[in-house]
Amino acid sequence: MDKLRAKIRDIPDFPKPGILFRDITPLVKDPAALRLAIHQLVHPFVGEDITAVAGMEARGFIFGALAAWELGVGFVPLRKPGKLPYNVQSIDYDLEYGSARLEVHLDALGVGDRVLMVDDLLATGGTARASCSLVESLGAEVAACAFVIELDALEGREALHGRRVHSLLHY
C-alpha cells in the first residue's frame, strides 16, 4: 500500500482552515497506481456474486466505474438532485453543517441485486450510510462498502452500523 499512499497528496487548510485534504488526483493520473488501487479495492469481493457497483458523487464515480468494469458488472451512479433524467428515488440526510440529498434512477437496482458501494473517502460516514439506505430502498442488498481512503479518527465505519467495510489506506 506504500505505492498508493505515495500518490495521495496532502493539502493543508483545504477547503477551509484546519482541514487536511487528501487529494487523490495524483493517484488517478498514474495508470499503474490506478490499476493497483482498483485491483486492491475489488479483490476481496471477487466471486461474491456482486451484481452492481454503486458510486457516490462525484469521486466515487471514478473508482466505482472502474471497480464495476474490473468485476464485470454494471455501474450505478448515486447523484446530487436534479442530475438524473428519469424517475428517481431520493434520500435526504444530515451533514455536519446542513443537509444533502442523493438520487438514483428507480429502475437502476432491485430485488436480487447485491451491490458494492464505492467512494474515494470514508470520513464521518453520513454520505455512505445514506447511500446504503438509498440502494436498499430499491430492494437491493448492500454486499459491502469499499473506500480508497478511510479517516479513522472520524469513525465513519461505526456510522455504517456493522456493514462490511474495506478501505485501502487508513489515516
UniProtKB/Swiss-Prot annotation:
Pathway: Purine metabolism; AMP biosynthesis via salvage pathway; AMP from adenine: step 1/1
Pfam families: Pribosyltran
GO cellular component: cytoplasm
Keywords in alphabetical order: Cytoplasm, Glycosyltransferase, Purine salvage, Transferase
GO BP: any one term: AMP salvage
Similarity section: Belongs to the purine/pyrimidine phosphoribosyltransferase family.
Purpose of the protein: Catalyzes a salvage reaction resulting in the formation of AMP, that is energically less costly than de novo synthesis.
Assembly behavior: Homodimer.
Annotated protein name in UniProt: Adenine phosphoribosyltransferase
Organism name: Methylococcus capsulatus (strain ATCC 33009 / NCIMB 11132 / Bath)
Gene: apt
